[in-house]
Amino acid sequence: MGKLTLLLLVLLGWLQYSLWLGKNGIHDYVRVKNDVAMQERNNSKLKARNDQLSAEIDDLTGGQEAIEERSRSELGMIKPGETFYRLIIDKSKENTSRPSTPNNTQ
């Protein structure tokens, strides 16, 4: 019975070594798992970017809204019958209207 027990202990030791330190062991599993998680995060970011670019391409090829928006913002164009209002903030009134805080030196 002693030889069988010794053989089983050696086999158990070898299996534990292979599991923890050997090729494709726990260490490699954790590393690959982390690599996969990082790649999935990267893929989801790239997919969101691709979806956004795809929607913009669809809008530019078929829709007039994007063309109209760029014409308004970049070129300052307006439609016939529209009135354009530009609001300009008066910096001198903005500075004087703020309440001044007293300097308390003690």
Swiss-Prot record:
| Cytoplasmic topological segments | 1-3
Annotated GO biological processes are: FtsZ-dependent cytokinesis
Entry GO terms, CC: cell division site; cell septum; plasma membrane
Q: Which UniProt keyword terms apply here?
A: Cell cycle, Cell division, Cell inner membrane, Cell membrane, Coiled coil, Membrane, Transmembrane, Transmembrane helix
This protein's name: Cell division protein FtsB
Tell me the compartments it is located in: Cell inner membrane
Q: What does this protein do?
A: Essential cell division protein. May link together the upstream cell division proteins, which are predominantly cytoplasmic, with the downstream cell division proteins, which are predominantly periplasmic.
Q: Which residues form a coiled coil?
A: 29-70
**Domain of life from the UniProt record:** Bacteria
Query: What is the topology of this protein in the membrane according to its UniProt annotation?
Result: Single-pass type II membrane protein
Q: Quaternary structure per UniProt? A: Part of a complex composed of FtsB, FtsL and FtsQ.
InterPro entries noted in UniProt: Cell_div_FtsB (IPR023081), FtsL/DivIC (IPR007060)
Stored Pfam families? DivIC
Report the gene name: ftsB
Regions of this protein lying in the Periplasmic compartment:
22-106
Where are the bilayer-spanning segments?
A: 4-21
Q: Which family does the entry's similarity section mention?
A: Belongs to the FtsB family.
